[in-house]
Regions:
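P-loop NTP-binding module
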Residues: 1-129
Length: 129
């Protein structure tokens, strides 16, 4: 990976130069090399709005997923949320309290929440009865 989202947002690369095609068909990744300083400000910038529009136009028949920090850890999610069509809440098994989940849902009250994923759960074999 020579260039990433960092260079794209710094206007040092074009979108097609930072997209990575892993071996999965119809799957593209836009990686980040390092944390973006002042991420809340960056996410509210015209550059990110343009990026989202560009991805919408380029991949109009696909689903675009943005992996963001936890809702309660920063303002990043709240800042960029109005730009998204829908939201999928990811809850880490054993790491989030009921209160934290409820508070996260409160922050997402005006979003088009399409579901919740329980992540980091250990599979358990159970009999039907």
């Amino acid at each position: 990976m020579e260039k990433s989202l960092n260079e794209l947002l710094a206007d040092e690369a074009e979108l097609q130069d930072v997209l990575v095609n892993p071996t999965l068909p119809r799957f593209v990744v836009l990686p980040t090399r390092e944390p973006i300083p002042l991420s809340t400000e960056v996410l509210s910038s015209p550059a990110v709005s343009h990026l989202i529009s560009d991805l919408r136009d380029r991949y109009n028949s696909r689903i675009v997923i943005f992996d963001l920090p936890p809702v309660l850890s920063s303002d990043d999610v709240i800042t960029v949320l109005p730009k998204f069509d829908c939201v999928l809440l990811v809850v880490a098994n054993g790491m989030n309290s009921k209160k934290e989940i409820e508070e996260s849902l409160h922050h997402l009250a005006n979003a088009n929440l399409i579901g919740t994923v329980l992540n980091k759960a250990e599979p358990q074999n159970r009999s039907y009865y």
